[in-house]
Amino acid sequence: MTSVVIVVSVAVLLGVLVITDSSWPCVFNSTAKWSLQHIESVTLERPRWSRVKKPSSSKWRHLRTILQWWQERRKQAHLLDTWQKQAMDMDECLTRYRDAKHDDICVISE
């Protein structure tokens, strides 16, 4: 029903489709008369919330949450990729500590 309202609205706005008194479409006929009451009765109907639309809105909400999570994950992955690496690896630090015979101090931190 909604698609019919959209098609009729677009056709009337473009002047391509004009509904005549006999309810047959006339293409490129701008002189034909059409009933305004018929158009208003079609376009003024309020869409009602149905059981079909509620699950679809929750699915859209779930999809939005997944996309937000994925975007945050990509940002974190980019930060980890561009993070400056430490000048010294942990094993290298321990090796230097053993080789220096306790003259150097190796600080191990996270």
Curated annotation (Swiss-Prot):
<dbReference type="GO" id="GO:0042025">
    <property type="term" value="C:host cell nucleus"/>
</dbReference>
<keyword id="KW-0732">Signal</keyword>
<feature type="glycosylation site" description="N-linked (GlcNAc...) asparagine">
    <location>
        <position position="29"/>
    </location>
</feature>
<feature type="signal peptide">
    <location>
        <begin position="1"/>
        <end position="22"/>
    </location>
</feature>
<keyword id="KW-0843">Virulence</keyword>
<keyword id="KW-0325">Glycoprotein</keyword>
<keyword id="KW-1035">Host cytoplasm</keyword>
<dbReference type="GO" id="GO:0030430">
    <property type="term" value="C:host cell cytoplasm"/>
</dbReference>
<keyword id="KW-0964">Secreted</keyword>
<feature type="short sequence motif" description="RxLR-dEER">
    <location>
        <begin position="61"/>
        <end position="74"/>
    </location>
</feature>
<comment type="function">
    <text>Secreted effector that completely suppresses the host cell death induced by cell death-inducing proteins.</text>
</comment>
<dbReference type="GO" id="GO:0005576">
    <property type="term" value="C:extracellular region"/>
</dbReference>
<comment type="similarity">
    <text>Belongs to the RxLR effector family.</text>
</comment>
<protein>
    <recommendedName>
        <fullName>Secreted RxLR effector protein 89</fullName>
    </recommendedName>
</protein>
<keyword id="KW-1048">Host nucleus</keyword>
